[in-house]
Amino acid sequence: MTQMTVQVVTPDGIKYDHHAKFISVTTPDGEMGILPNHINVIAPLQVHEMKIRRVGEDDRVDWVAINGGIIEIKDNVVTIVADSAERDRDIDVSRAERAKLRAERDIAEAETTHDINEVQRAKVALRRALNRINVSKK
């Protein structure tokens, strides 16, 4: 069976490294499904839930919360360089819930002061927190 090596790398080190038969990521243009022997690509990534179907483990699916970055696909090696990333099993849900509440509070506060930059920053923080919460439930 043809397979790909999938690595997710952050400034903190390698967060994921396994062989896969399928992965799904989200770019600014939408969702992208990747199978072995995919054409070489470099693309930006959105904050999203990355789905990985592993090789040799019947229907084993791993989920990784990706918080932006880029993907490079070359010669059956998929490398994702992300600002931050967490596997579903590693997510501290209570910390993510606190981040969600903090971001919601920051959005409300920034909207009352009409601070557009702070609203945008808080919305990104909210998207990241919600992404982590959603991935933790997979």
Swiss-Prot record:
SUPFAM superfamilies per record: Epsilon subunit of F1F0-ATP synthase N-terminal domain (SSF51344)
Keyword set includes Ion transport: yes
Annotated GO CC locations: plasma membrane; proton-transporting ATP synthase complex
Subcellular location: Cell membrane
Topology in membrane: Peripheral membrane protein
Keywords: ATP synthesis, Cell membrane, CF(1), Hydrogen ion transport, Ion transport, Membrane, Transport
Keyword Transport: yes
Principal localisation: membrane
Molecular-function GO term, any one: ATP binding
Assembly and binders: F-type ATPases have 2 components, CF(1) - the catalytic core - and CF(0) - the membrane proton channel. CF(1) has five subunits: alpha(3), beta(3), gamma(1), delta(1), epsilon(1). CF(0) has three main subunits: a, b and c.
Function: Produces ATP from ADP in the presence of a proton gradient across the membrane.
Family stated for the protein in its record: Belongs to the ATPase epsilon chain family.
Record protein name field: ATP synthase epsilon chain
Organismal lineage: Bacteria, Bacillati, Bacillota, Bacilli, Lactobacillales
Gene symbol of the encoding locus: atpC
